[in-house]
């Protein structure tokens, strides 16, 4: 399965790398494992903790739907990566069913992102990026 890492998400990872190299590395490893997992789409669109992605050295994820965005017409999700320096970060994404891709829209610190506030700068950016796909 191909992952579409959007430009703003790339910038988020670049900024994370500048401040927390181990967390950025954990995010990149998780994305690589997701891309290599043939069941990733099912796992990433099912709410729950502990799905493992990848084969050789699987990573454990916590998957949740972004409910506020969904109620406003954006079927977006987020995952966190357990047992890594990136556990305090959330990867926000959507599944683009026409292209069968996971589109990574943002990597955010959990304390800096309020999922209920769609008027925040980061929420607007994520929603704009999703609608532009």
Residue ranges and their predicted role:
Residues 1-88, 96-103, 107-133:
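Basic, Lys/Arg-enriched alpha-helical interface segments
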């Amino acid at each position: 399965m191909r992952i579409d890492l959007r430009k703003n998400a790339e910038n988020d990872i670049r900024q994370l790398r500048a401040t927390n190299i181990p967390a950025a590395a954990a995010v990149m490893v998780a994305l690589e494992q997701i891309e290599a997992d043939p069941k990733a789409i099912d796992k990433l669109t099912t709410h729950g903790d502990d799905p493992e992605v990848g084969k050789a050295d699987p990573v454990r994820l916590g998957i949740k739907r972004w409910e506020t965005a969904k109620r406003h017409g954006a079927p977006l999700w987020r995952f966190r990566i357990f047992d890594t320096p990136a556990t305090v970060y959330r990867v926000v994404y959507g599944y683009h069913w026409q292209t069968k891709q996971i589109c990574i829209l943002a990597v955010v610190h959990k304390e800096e992102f309020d999922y209920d506030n769609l008027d925040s700068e980061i929420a607007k950016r994520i929603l704009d990026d999703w609608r532009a796909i």
